[in-house]
Amino acid sequence: MAGLDTNVLVRWLVDDDAGQSRRIAEMLESAARRDETLFVPLTVMLELEWVLRSRYAFAKPDILLALNALLETRELEFQTEPAVERALHAYRQGTADFADCVHAAACWVEGKAPMLTLDAKAAKLADAKLLAA
C-alpha cells in the first residue's frame, strides 16, 4: 500500500489536467485489480478541503460531495476513518470550519473529547467545549 498526497486527490477531483487525471485513474484501476488500497492521511483531508475551498472556490455542499465521494471509493483507505466520517457529519450539520470538525472528531476517536477551544463556532460541536474564562 502506498500513501497519497493532497495534489493527487485534487487532480482527480477537479480533473483539470487530462494527463495527470489519466495517470491517477490508471493507478486506481491498478490498485483495484490487485485488490489493494491507497492510504489517505488525515492531514491530507484537512489540506484537501482547504485547497478545494480556497483555490477552486468550492462551496460547502460541493466540498461535502467531493469528500464523501472519496470515502466511498473502495481503493482508498483513510487514516482514522471514523474521525473523517464524524468530522464530515459535524461539518454538514453545523457552522464550524472543517478543520475544527476534524480536530474535535480526532479527540473523540482517541477518547479525549471534549476538545477545549476558544472558538465559539467550534465549541458548538458535540465533541468540543468552550474554554471558560
Task: Enumerate the language-model features and the residues they cover.
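Short beta-strand scaffold positions
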Residues: 4, 39-40, 78, 98, ...
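Acidic, PIN/NYN-like endoribonuclease modules and their adjacent C-terminal/linker elements
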Residues: 104-133
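Residues that scaffold the ATP/ADP-binding catalytic core of kinase and kinase-like folds
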Residues: 11-13, 51, 125-126
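Short, well-structured N-terminal submotif of metal-dependent ribonuclease cores
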Residues: 1-40, 55-62, 68, 132-133
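Alpha-helix capping/helix-boundary segments
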Residues: 8, 44, 83, 102-103, ...
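Short active-site oxyanion
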Residues: 34-38, 75, 111-114
